[in-house]
Amino acid sequence: VGSEMCIRDSCNELSVKYGYEKLTFLEGDIADYEGVDQVDMVVTLHACDTATDYALAKAVGWHAKVILSVPCCQHEINGQIENDVLKPILKHGLLKERFSAIVTDALRAEYLEREGYEVQVLEFIDMEHTPKNILIRAIDIGKKGKNSKRIKDCEAFLNVEPTLGRLLGMQKD
């Protein structure tokens, strides 16, 4: 599910060409998508800001066996993060942006572990090609993580409430 019709059409043609009849690409907003009850694998590629969170929440809800997510811009945490101890980092826009991106993806990995996934955060392509080269790879192992307190402590320390936590019911725990 994505917003670029030309990419959707091209990807659908490739899936037919290579015999992947059950692989489909749709145009739309992932937050509103209700087309299936279960999927085997969810792949996100540069889903901007909280679109990644909506896709990850859908993947968890579908009990996807595999999640491959390449996040894009991580603006949400950048707009929320506050901490006097970290002022030397947060007072500089560029450093705050990069730190916020790392925090965002680290918390995403923690949420996925909490939901029963084994998670790796990897660099999947050389920095010379794109600075957005982080892959969050998650494999469903069916065993919920016991890291809720660690997540809550981190969020409280940074004064953040990420969308993925809300979507997965973390703020209620």
What is each stretch, according to the model?
Residues 1-7:
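Short, small-residue-biased leader/transition segments that mark boundaries at the very start
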Residues 10-173:
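Class I S-adenosyl-L-methionine
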